[in-house]
Amino acid sequence: MTDPRFENSVIFICSHSAEGAMGLVINTPCENIAFPELLDQLNIDYGHNITPKAQLKNIQLHEGGPVETGRGFILHSADYAQETTLIISETIALTATLDILSAIACGKGPLYYLIALGFSGWGRGQLENEIVRNSWLTIEADAELVFKTDLELKLSRAHAKLGINFSMLSSQFGNA
């Protein structure tokens, strides 16, 4: 991958069709805003929440990708759903509404979640071509990796699921 924005990225593909694909980077922290600040910017009242403000500061935001970085996307456990929720698998769903952020702030949201600003997108056939060129390694969707693995361990855990020793990887690939 020659785009430095995706170097060492673990991306969860949320949707894929003949028209293209959409995914979220799940291992890059968003350092320029904290969750309480995001709530304030969006005018989401969390003053009467059951989650202490100090705990809200610990909710990590992620850089989901370079597209529409002003939009929020919440990848979450399937125990929570709204009318607009996209069910991805039996255990993982995606919601992009203010209501879910409010629910999370009030301690009434999904059991597990990952909040991302922006997303990664591919046009028709683009992702498939990048995979053929060995730009990406793929694994099955894994809720444990998405929600329960520490940020700095996600890449090595993804490699381990493939049986790959990261130190043995080369940036030069080819096909035989």
Range-by-range predicted roles:
Residues 1-115, 120-176:
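A short aromatic-anchored loop/beta-hairpin motif
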